[in-house]
């Protein structure tokens, strides 16, 4: 989970964790 991808981490599975 990064700066913007942190939202996807708690809302849904970290699918965008690879793409920052």
Curated annotation (Swiss-Prot):
Is this entry keyworded Transit peptide?
no
* Top-level taxonomy: Eukaryota, Viridiplantae, Streptophyta, Embryophyta, Tracheophyta
One Gene Ontology BP term is: killing of cells of another organism
Keywords attached to this Swiss-Prot or TrEMBL record, sorted alphabetically, are: Antimicrobial, Fungicide
Q: Which residues form a coiled coil?
A: none
Query: What's this protein's name?
Result: Cicerin
> Which residue ranges does the record annotate as region Disordered?
1-20
- Reported function: Has antifungal activity against B.cinerea, F.oxysporum and M.arachidicola. Inhibits cell-free translation in rabbit reticulocyte lysate system.
């Amino acid at each position: 989970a990064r700066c913007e991808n942190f939202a996807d981490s708690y809302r849904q599975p970290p699918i965008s964790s690879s793409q920052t």
